Amino acid sequence: MRRPESSPRIAEPEAALTGYRPSVIPYELGFNLLVLALDGAALALTGRSPRLAAPAILLWCLGVFLGVLAFGGQVAFMRAFFAARLASYAIFLHGPLCWIGLAWVLRRQGRAGGSEGGEEGSKPSPWAPRAALALGLLLACVGVDAFLIEPTALQIRRVQVPSARVQEPLRIVVLADLQTDAIGPYEREVLARIAAEEPDLLLLAGDYLQCWSHEDHERETLALQDALRASGIRPRLGAFAVGGDCESRGWEATFAGTRIQPLQGVAHVDSRIRIQGLSLGESFRGAPALPPTQQLRIVLGHRPDFALAPAEADLLLAGHTHGGQVQLPLIGPLVTLSGVERSWAAGEPTLLPSGATLIVSRGVGMERATAPRLRFLCRPELLVVEVVPSAP
């Protein structure tokens, strides 16, 4: 295996997160106390008369919206993510409490024949408490799945790519967006699953650690190195990594003492494979042009946006989007933070006009910092790409 050829180094953006630790707890506490008061007000209004249930719900929604704006705006860094975090508290914590409470109030009113004052015609529909209970339970179930189950429900996704440039199958495992602030049992399980796949190549697509402070980052870097060394991962043709949004200058030291080789430039593997590793900036703008070759041409970048520019390659691999982290039926990912099409960002293998195949991994981690830590209908994944000889 030849050492990577150097390419002109592009200044990487500094990770805005490392070393910055805003205190968001007071704003979270204040917001939740506000919504708790809104919960009580909605139940109290409905208790006066079933006719007030709809206005109470509207006032609750308005109060939550204004609360998200007021408290979310207090955090300057990653403000949109923090607003989403507050909204998730309202929807998945207070939502079930409020709707189940409304179901109880409406059921009691139905048994009593209406409001406590016995106002004529104020008896709720017999379906109202059932609908409120069903909605509350639905929100609770979605919340449990999104916050407690899916984030660690690791999936192995296998994609087969035919190519005339290989004479025998080549197994590539792509690890994207580990993006953790604490190396623990889940991260060690991910590494064990990689080792079990016995890959020919291991490619890492950026975003490895997302910690609040330099001290936390240093501690978790050592933990990641220990976990990698203990994992038994030994790709036959090597392991290569590129930087992502969470990495700052000097990120290459993350893999010191491990089998993983940071790559910005070109590596020729076993004379049959050319891997082009992109800097973060290049993964946004496009891959630099390279001379023609008969080798299998792989381009590895963090963001998939480089696929929008022409690239002389057979296989384009990226991460960054997390598959959206939240997907809805018939809609797909709600947010991708990328300029590529939603289906690309969601991970669907795409044959580009150039003949290259683009595959974006949903990643194994999730957004940290002030963002809500959830996945919904978008399980974390290890991507296993089998490049096989194409039929003659």
Enumerate the predicted regions with their spans:
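Non-catalytic terminal accessory segments
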Residues: 1-151
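Membrane-embedded segments
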Residues: 152-155, 165-257, 261
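Beta-strand-turn-beta hairpins that frame and shape the catalytic cleft
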Residues: 154, 159-173, 260, 267-277, ...
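Active-site metal-binding loops of divalent metal-dependent hydrolases
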Residues: 175-180, 206-208, 244-246, 266-267, ...
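Short, Asp-centered acidic motifs that coordinate Mg2+ and/or phosphate
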Residues: 200-201, 240, 260-261, 273, ...
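Binuclear metal-dependent hydrolase catalytic cores centered on His/Asp/Glu-rich metal-binding motifs
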Residues: 250, 254-259, 264-308, 371-379
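Conserved beta-sheet core of the metallophosphoesterase superfamily
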Residues: 304-383
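Short beta-strand-to-coil "C-cap" segments at the C-terminal boundary of structured domains/repeats
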Residues: 385-391
